[in-house]
Design a protein with these regions (language model features):
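Residues at alpha-helix boundaries and the short loops/turns that link adjacent helices
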Residues: 16-19, 73, 87, 103
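A short structural micro-motif
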Residues: 32, 46, 68, 86, ...
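Short alpha-helical scaffolding segments that buttress acidic/His motifs in well-ordered protein cores
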Residues: 40-44, 61-68, 96-101, 112
Length: 118
């Protein structure tokens, strides 16, 4: 593990998803799941989110669209909360969901809107 990339990823992950959520995920990790948590933190958050060529807001919008396209609604809800935390507006969420609905289909759009309304 690249410790510097892990620490950078940990900071990014906490900034988007909340320190409470991340610390709980890491604390609940056991010998079986700890390597996965480390991989997610180092590569998703340290490598991908740590690349400064895209700002966090743009990266978050991309994630919302991609995760919706994959129909991973539990993960989508988590990233929706993160998007709102970093300043993506309700109007921007609505625009993303219109795009998702057109390209991914009505059922995916319906599910995303249902989650977003909560």
């Amino acid at each position: 593990m690249d410790r510097e990339r892990f620490e950078k990823g940990l900071a990014k992950r906490k900034a988007v998803l909340s320190a409470e959520h991340v610390e709980r995920s890491l604390a609940q990790a056991d010998d079986f799941s700890r390597p996965f948590q480390e991989l997610v933190t180092e590569f998703c958050w340290g490598f991908a989110w740590g690349d400064e060529r895209l700002d966090p807001k743009t990266r978050s919008m991309l994630n919302l669209a991609m995760i919706a396209a994959l129909n991973r609604m539990h993960e989508w809800e988590l990233h929706l909360k993160g998007a709102l935390r970093i300043g993506i507006t309700q109007d921007e969420i609505q625009a993303i969901l219109h795009q998702v609905t057109v390209y991914c289909g009505i059922p995916v759009g319906v599910e995303c809107f249902r989650i977003a309304k909560r």
